[in-house]
Curated annotation (Swiss-Prot):
One of its GO terms (cellular component) is cytoplasm. Keywords: Amino-acid biosynthesis, Aromatic amino acid biosynthesis, ATP-binding, Cytoplasm, Kinase, Nucleotide-binding, Transferase. InterPro entries: GHMP_kinase_C_dom, GHMP_kinase_C_sf, GHMP_kinase_N_dom, Ribosomal_Su5_D2-typ_SF, Ribsml_uS5_D2-typ_fold_subgr, SK_arc. It holds the Pfam family GHMP_kinases_C. It is found in: Cytoplasm. It comes from Methanocella arvoryzae (strain DSM 22066 / NBRC 105507 / MRE50). Disulfide bonds: none annotated. This is Shikimate kinase.
Length: 290
């Protein structure tokens, strides 16, 4: 039995590391997974190489949940740069879980699929909090606000917006984040989260960005460059190194910010917030560029 799953990357409104409460939005960058149930072993393979423990554990936990005694072959491909703050791990786990459920011809509630992926991330040590907020955005689409400690979805909204992404060439793995320094800024991150709960996502993003840039040692220059152009919804994404900005769907705001950010080393591109749930997608077979 073989099937496919697709899940989205995401951008940060509030990083959950400081206070265990977070907010994120899905973006139009996808990870595809193909799962074939066969044999006794669970084996994962990532296009371009990489650590396959997360997708293997996500598949294993899903099969346990479904009561299916089988091995599996998992293959993933992705448009999301790894260790960039754009939620590549959440997308990989979600896509794998969706594909596994489909291969087993069974269905699981989307939030339960998210919780399986979060547990897999904690089990293999790729996340500090399990990234329930990022995983919810990746799976459900739109903007989400969550309590990561309780694995509770507090709020989900549709948001129509273009997104400008600046992805520097370097990488920053979430599991290597300086948690102690992040917890020092907790009172102010709590304030930013309250602002986000009131629906002022752009203001919350900017505050989150300045706070985490300071705590984690990233430059705030890209945020200031966006503010100079009147783009107020801008932040460091996750634990970096990427930055994301919400911009108008109309006019030249996206082009102006893309030009400004292109002065920095790395890649700049424009995408959009995705409001459709990944669990609704048909999924695509992984076609590797080999």
């Amino acid at each position: 039995m073989k099937s496919h799953g697709t899940a989205y990357g995401a951008g940060t409104i509030i990083n959950a590391i400081a206070v265990w409460k977070g907010s994120a939005f899905a973006i139009d960058l996808k990870t595809h997974a193909t799962v074939e149930l066969r044999g006794d072993l669970i084996e994962g393979e990532i296009e371009g190489g990489g650590d396959s423990r997360l997708i293997e554990r996500a598949c294993e936990l899903t099969l346990d949940k479904l009561g299916v005694d089988s091995g599996a072959k998992i293959r993933t491909t992705s448009e999301i740069p790894i260790a960039s703050g754009l939620k590549s791990s959440s997308a990989a786990a979600n896509a794998t879980i969706i594909a596994t459920c489909r291969a087993a011809r069974q269905s699981v509630d989307p939030l339960e699929m998210v919780r399986i992926g979060v547990q897999a991330a904690l089990d293999v040590g790729v996340s500090v909090t399990g990234a329930f907020d990022d995983a919810c955005a990746s799976m459900l689409g739109g903007v989400v606000l969550t309590d990561n400690r309780e694995k509770a979805l507090l709020k989900r909204e549709v948001l129509e917006s273009k997104v400008v992404v600046y992805a520097p060439d370097k990488k920053a793995f979430s599991a290597q984040t300086d948690v102690k320094k992040s917890r020092l800024i907790a009172p102010w991150v709590e304030t930013a989260f309250d602002i986000a709960m009131r629906g002022d996502y752009r203001k919350a993003m900017a505050l989150n960005g300045f706070l985490y840039c300071s705590a984690l040692g990233f430059s705030a220059e890209p945020i200031l460059a966006a503010l100079e152009l009147g783009v107020t919804g801008v932040s460091l994404s996750g634990t970096g190194p990427s930055y994301v900005a919400l911009v108008s769907e109309e006019g030249e705001e996206a082009d102006r910010l893309k030009k400004a950010w292109s002065a920095y080393p790395g890649r700049v591109f424009v995408t959009e917030v995705i409001n459709e749930g990944a669990f609704l997608l048909e999924g695509e077979e992984c076609r590797w560029n080999t």
